């Protein structure tokens, strides 16, 4: 994905989330205001009050749904951060130098099992060159 | 059709009789009154609508024949024909009349019933309306209505809405109060529920942050609100995705995966000629220092998948090592290492610890202390060997997983071999064969009392970290130096052995003495060369003497 398209997608996602937040917030405020407006019974007969009872219940449910929508937005933001942010490192196997040296010694020991091993002598290379000089 | 029928009728009526008197009489009818003629025709032949042209034509033909025969026969036939026509007409009329009358009666009865119903209803309503003003009208009310509606109940009055009461305000207030109370209760319940949801999600995402801080990659799951973790990012070849979700029973988090086994570990055993296990090693990963249960589960899944992947890789490689004596089934891989011993590689999937180690016989109890020490040392050595083989297998598999490193550092190998082919068994076999070949050479030299110096130069000895160690184990070519002292007075023979893991030159022996430098492809040739050299020296010494 190119950086431009990624930026456009990021902007679009941001706008969508902001729009969701604004809508949910507006819903909560407007529904609360509506409940307060119809809470008073002065100058109303029972035939007018009856439908307002159901309106209050509907507004209450709408407020709760708006809050749930805000929680969903929060969940999306968290998931987006967890899944899309790049990691600077990767899980590694915990090795240490003593273990490395131990492994090396063990490998050498097993490889030289039942063998008579001599240390490499620096003089051996010099001795090797001597026959060449004599040949000359 | 009607006009034609009328014409035919006229013709037939004219041809009824050929007597002059009758013809004259008919002419008088025509002149006098045409209606009478029609009436006569109808009386004789029935309605015009029943007349058919074919029938009339037949009659004309018959009459022409009758005229030729006799008047009596013609009269008789005419009578019969009339009778036949009359009978037909009667039958048709009866059928038509009966059908029409039945349908008409049925329709008429339905209409009468509807009218009766309407009249009865009108009478009831009218009587009920007049019952207040006229006593006799009660008699005309139907019994059903009389029993259900009292007399004089239908009046000329309008209905008014009920008057408002003082309790209406109280009722409305109670309704509103109840509504507000229930809404308040609903909000508090929602608050409790959502608070619980937030707390749960807080714990969930806190655990996920720990997973992310441990550098495990996380992904969104399609069709689910939960996230998935890829637990094979380091050493596995498989995808290794697990869904992170909460257990409803214990309120803890788990990784839901689809692995076949709940526990897996590579096990390497050494078997003797009787197929008894004399040494074994079951791989175990070091414990992770983390407080999160979820992370522990992820590390465990990683280990299980790693072991399963390495086992699959070994099986894959065993298919191409048949020429080196490797046998395999779905459960085990057998690598012969000598005439009497076999290395067995299996995947241990049960939780039971089957690491048995050295198998002791009953006779071992009767051995002396020296034998006991020897057996113990042998046991430890076998254990060490199995552990090392297990470690090397894992290290080589890690290197196999790092494809990019292998491709970049050793391009010639990438071109020579399949990049996806694992390389685990072949290095192990290679180093074992190297040990055996060196051992054989030393034994041969000792048998002939030839002094030597064996100076191996293993690639891993210079490794500074584990990455270099991994690379060193897969180096294609080694270099081992030998120094053969054939005589105390003559210079030594220098031999450089360069075994090759891949390629056509499996093993190259370069021998150099004071007179020449030779190259051999097998140990046998090297031994022949040394013998030849010794013989040459002996012959030269004899000549000198």
From Swiss-Prot, chain A:
Record organism: Schizosaccharomyces pombe (strain 972 / ATCC 24843) (Fission yeast)
Role of this protein: Component of the Mediator complex, a coactivator involved in the regulated transcription of nearly all RNA polymerase II-dependent genes. Mediator functions as a bridge to convey information from gene-specific regulatory proteins to the basal RNA polymerase II transcription machinery. Mediator is recruited to promoters by direct interactions with regulatory proteins and serves as a scaffold for the assembly of a functional preinitiation complex with RNA polymerase II and the general transcription factors.
MF term (GO), any: transcription coactivator activity
Family stated for the protein in its record: Belongs to the Mediator complex subunit 22 family.
Gene3D superfamilies xref list: Mediator of RNA polymerase II transcription subunit 22
Gene Ontology biological process terms in this record: positive regulation of transcription initiation by RNA polymerase II; transcription initiation at RNA polymerase II promoter
Compartment annotation: Nucleus
Broad class of where this protein is predominantly found: nucleus
Protein name in the entry: Mediator of RNA polymerase II transcription subunit 22
Subunit relationships: Component of the Mediator complex.
UniProt KW keywords: Activator, Nucleus, Transcription, Transcription regulation
One cellular-component annotation, GO: nucleus
Gene: med22
Curated annotation (Swiss-Prot), chain B:
GO cellular component, one term: core mediator complex
Biased composition (Polar residues): 149-162
Keywords: Activator, Nucleus, Transcription, Transcription regulation
Gene Ontology molecular function, alphabetical: transcription coactivator activity; transcription coregulator activity
UniProt keyword annotation of Nucleus present: yes
Alphabetical list of Pfam families matching this protein: Med17
Region (Disordered): 148-168
Any single GO BP term: positive regulation of transcription initiation by RNA polymerase II
Compartments (UniProt record): Nucleus
Family named by the database record: Belongs to the Mediator complex subunit 17 family.
Subunit structure: Component of the Mediator complex. Interacts with med18, prk1 and rbp1.
The protein's name in its UniProt record: Mediator of RNA polymerase II transcription subunit 17
Gene that this polypeptide is encoded by: med17
């Amino acid at each position: 994905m190119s950086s431009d398209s990624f930026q456009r997608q990021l902007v679009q996602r941001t706008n969508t989330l902001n729009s969701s937040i604004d809508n949910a917030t507006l819903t909560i405020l407007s529904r609360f205001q509506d409940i307060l407006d119809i809470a008073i019974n002065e100058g109303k007969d029972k035939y007018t009050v009856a439908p307002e009872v159901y309106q209050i219940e509907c507004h209450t449910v709408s407020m709760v749904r708006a809050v749930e929508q805000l929680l969903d937005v929060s969940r999306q933001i968290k998931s987006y951060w967890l899944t899309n942010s790049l990691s600077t490192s990767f899980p590694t196997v915990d090795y240490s130098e003593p273990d490395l040296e131990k492994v090396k010694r063990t490998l050498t020991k097993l490889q030289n099992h039942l063998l008579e091993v001599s240390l490499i002598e620096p003089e051996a290379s010099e001795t090797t060159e001597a026959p060449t000089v004599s040949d000359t | 059709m009607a006009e034609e029928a009328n014409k035919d009728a006229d013709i037939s009526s004219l041809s009824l009789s050929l007597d002059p008197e009758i013809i004259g009489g008919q002419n008088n009818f025509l002149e006098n009154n045409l209606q009478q003629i029609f009436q006569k025709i109808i009386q004789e032949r029935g309605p015009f609508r029943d007349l058919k042209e074919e029938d009339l034509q037949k009659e004309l033909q018959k009459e022409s024949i009758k005229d030729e025969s006799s008047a009596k026969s013609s009269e008789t036939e005419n009578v019969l024909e009339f009778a036949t026509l009359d009978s037909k007409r009667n039958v048709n009329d009866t059928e038509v009349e009966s059908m029409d009358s039945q349908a008409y009666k049925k329709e008429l009865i339905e209409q009468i019933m509807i009218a009766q119903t309407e009249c009865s209803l009108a009478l009831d309503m009218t009587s009920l309306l007049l019952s207040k003003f006229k006593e006799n009208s009660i008699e005309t009310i139907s019994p059903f209505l009389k029993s259900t509606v009292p007399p004089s109940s239908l009046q000329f009055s309008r209905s008014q809405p009920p008057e408002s009461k003082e309790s209406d305000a109280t009722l409305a207030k109670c309704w509103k109060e109840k509504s507000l109370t229930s809404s308040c209760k609903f909000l508090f319940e929602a608050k409790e529920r959502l608070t619980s949801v937030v707390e749960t999600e807080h714990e969930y995402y806190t655990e996920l942050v720990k997973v992310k801080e441990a550098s495990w990659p996380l992904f969104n799951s399609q069709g689910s609100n939960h996230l998935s973790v890829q637990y094979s990012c380091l050493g596995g070849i498989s995808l290794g995705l697990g869904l992170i979700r909460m257990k409803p029973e214990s309120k803890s988090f788990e990784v839901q995966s689809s692995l076949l086994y709940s526990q897996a570990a590579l096990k390497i055993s050494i078997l003797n000629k009787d197929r008894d296990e004399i040494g074994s090693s079951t791989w175990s990963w070091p414990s992770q220092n983390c407080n999160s249960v979820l992370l522990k589960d992820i590390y465990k899944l990683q280990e299980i998948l790693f072991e399963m992947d390495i086992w699959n890789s070994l099986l894959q490689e065993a298919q191409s090592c048949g020429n080196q004596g490797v046998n395999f089934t779905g459960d085990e891989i057998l690598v012969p290492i000598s005439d009497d011993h076999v290395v067995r590689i299996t995947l241990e999937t049960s939780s039971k610890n089957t690491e048995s180690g050295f198998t002791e016989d009953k006779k071992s109890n009767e051995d002396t202390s020296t034998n006991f020490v020897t057996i113990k040392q042998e046991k430890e050595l076998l254990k060490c060997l199995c552990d090392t083989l297990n470690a090397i297998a894992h290290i080589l598999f890690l290197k196999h997983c790092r494809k990019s490193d292998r491709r970049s550092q050793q391009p010639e190998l990438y071109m020579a071999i399949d990049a996806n082919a694992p390389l685990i068994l072949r290095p192990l076999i290679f180093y074992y064969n190297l040990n055996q070949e060196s051992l054989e050479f030393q034994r041969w030299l000792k048998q002939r009392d030839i002094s030597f110096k064996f100076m191996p130069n293993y690639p891993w000895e210079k490794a500074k970290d584990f990455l270099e160690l991994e690379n060193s184990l897969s180096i294609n070519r080694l270099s081992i130096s030998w120094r053969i002292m054939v005589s105390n007075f003559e210079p030594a023979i220098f031999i450089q052995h360069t075994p090759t893991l891949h390629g056509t030159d499996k093993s190259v022996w370069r021998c150099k003495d004071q007179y020449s430098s030779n190259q051999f492809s097998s140990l046998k040739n090297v031994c022949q060369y040394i013998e030849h050299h010794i013989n040459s020296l002996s012959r030269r010494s004899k000549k000198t003497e």
